[in-house]
Structure formats: C-alpha cells, structure tokens
Amino acid sequence: PTRRSSDLRVYTGVVLNTEPSAHVADEKVEQTEENMEILLDENVENKEDIDALGIQVGDIIAMDPRTVITESGYIKSRFLDDKLSAAILLGLAKAVKDEGITLHRKVSLLFTVYEEVGHGGSYVPADTAEMISVDMGCVGADLGCTERMVSICAKDSGGPYNYNLITALVNTAKAHGLDFAIDVYPHYGSDVEATLRAGYDIRHGLIGPGVYASHNYERSHMDGVKNTYELVKAYVTE
C-alpha cells in the first residue's frame, strides 16, 4: 500500500500478518485485525523512528489498485466500486460538451466519497426530481448480471427502488438494444437511499456495470462500462 502522511509525504509498504513466512512460522496465522500490520519500506525500529517520518494517527493508507485491462476487454482492479461509474459520468459530461448534446432537463452530476459510511447522498439540489445512483452492479450466485452487462437494481437491503423510474430505465435499455439485467441485491446500500433518509421527496434508482468480487480484487468488462454509459446517456438526453 501507499501511506500518505499529514504533511503530504508519501511512503510505501506492504500489508502482512505477523507471521507471513510459511518456511518460518510453525502454524498458519489467520488474517484478522489483531494480527495484521503495515510493514513500511523504511528503516524504522521504534515509535520514535515512525514519528520522525511524520506518520501519525489519522493518516491515509491506500492500497495499490493493481489495475489491468486485458485484450479481451476485462478490467481487473481494486476500487472498481466505484471508480468505474465515476469514469462513466465524467465521460458523459465530456460527451455533452464535445458533441454539443442538448439536455432536455436539468442534470446534476454529484460525486461523493461517503457512500460506504451511509451519508453520501444526504444532500442534492433542492429542485431534484429523480436521483439515479450510478454505482456497481452485483455479479454472483442467483443474480442475472455478468461483468459485460449493465445492472438495473429493483431492490436492495434498503427496500425497493422507485417502480416508475426502474421501468423507464428498463424501457430505455430495451429501446437501445443494451445488454442488461434486473436484479435484487441482498447486501447493498446506495447513495440515493441516504437522499431519501435526508427527507428528499424524489424518485430513486440504481444502476451500474457488473462487477465481480466486490470489495476485493474486482473484475468487470468494457462491455459493462459501455452498456452503462449508453443507458445513462440515452436516459438523460431523451
């Protein structure tokens, strides 16, 4: 991982358990919070050495994403949830500008880094009527989505999404011949649910490219990205 200190210095290191060497340790050590550590790529022996580097409580540790895009179109990386959809929305903004696309409604693009802690969508412009969370689509057992599709979520752990909005997204996907799946996510929450909890009276929806092995070393596909991009673009321009 990379560690960024409070004075913006950057250090590298590795995440290991306390007995990582199979040829040395007597028993296998499970990866739990109690026995995992950050091994800095610095010559340090004690707390004073660490302090001298400017490293302190509250500093950020960022894992190497290890991003790979294969010739067959697969995208492998950490943090595809939700870097992929951020790229999709930035691509949409660029297309609107470069191609002179006319939008027939007001469209706001909101980026948040707080979805995982529950309050990412707690603010939206006051005149918002619909809110679509462009997040990741789930891929796994009992789900129809693959990495090459755009997933349209009908319901997650927070309950069902707005039926009329989901129906409109499905009809748009069908009209444009997009490869999509409608799924229910059993262990999932999105920014737009925070919007509802904040008291906004809106229609809410959730879509995203299929991502396998979420919150892990994740995998998606360029086709899933393209299908999601085309769905968002078609929906906001028609």
Predicted regions and their residues:
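N-terminal hydrophobic/helix-forming segments and targeting peptides
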Residues: 3-238
